[in-house]
């Protein structure tokens, strides 16, 4: 099973990945987790460049994310799925669709196609979008902003709206949940939703 978690920075994705990992492991399942960008040596180098490096064009940013993602799929995700492990991702290609495609104005469909090529068409069984208001995201990030988080409020509003658009486009796999819920309640809703997946 491949599950991705999406949402604005500070929405609680990492917390929910860890809670789901613990729950699945308690059931005796092998679980692999990864963050994006990252998860491989090359991916971590790209992460440092895109989040903490200098300015770059929107297409350069999108292509770097896609390169990191291609490496993660080949080195980590596909081997884990092949041996029957569950894979939980703290971001996946939907992040690029909303951040670069919609937030940066490169085009939702263009960035989606780029990323589907990069991942060889590997789509999650379920994607959870943890929705929080853009101003709440910026509050939670606080004093640790990276290059993306330093964007203006209008950018973050476009990204938040982009996640809603994504859910409408792919209702069979994208589930939007209230990221302001208590983490325990949110974890229960996620586990309940995954029981329908298998």
Regions found by a protein language model. Give the residues of each.
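ATP-dependent small-molecule kinase phosphotransfer cores
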Residues: 29-119, 189, 193
């Amino acid at each position: 099973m491949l599950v991705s978690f999406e949402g604005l920075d500070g929405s609680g994705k990492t917390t929910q990945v860890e809670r789901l990992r613990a729950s699945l492991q308690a059931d005796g399942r092998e679980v692999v987790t990864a963050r994006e960008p990252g998860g491989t040596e090359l991916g971590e180098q790209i992460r440092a460049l895109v989040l903490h490096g200098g300015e770059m064009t929107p297409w350069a940013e999108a292509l770097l994310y896609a390169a990191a993602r291609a490496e993660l799929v080949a080195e980590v995700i596909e081997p884990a799925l092949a041996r029957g492990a569950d894979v939980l991702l703290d971001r996946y290609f939907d992040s690029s669709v909303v951040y670069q495609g919609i937030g940066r104005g490169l085009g939702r469909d263009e960035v989606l196609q780029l990323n589907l090529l990069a991942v060889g068409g590997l789509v999650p069984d379920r994607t959870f979008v943890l929705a929080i208001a853009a101003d709440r995201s910026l509050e939670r990030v606080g004093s640790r902003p990276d290059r993306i988080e330093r964007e203006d409020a209008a950018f973050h509003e476009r990204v938040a709206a982009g996640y809603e658009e994504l859910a409408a486009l792919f209702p069979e796999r994208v589930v939007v949940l209230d990221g302001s819920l208590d983490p325990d309640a949110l974890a229960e809703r996620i586990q309940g939703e995954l029981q329908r997946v298998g």
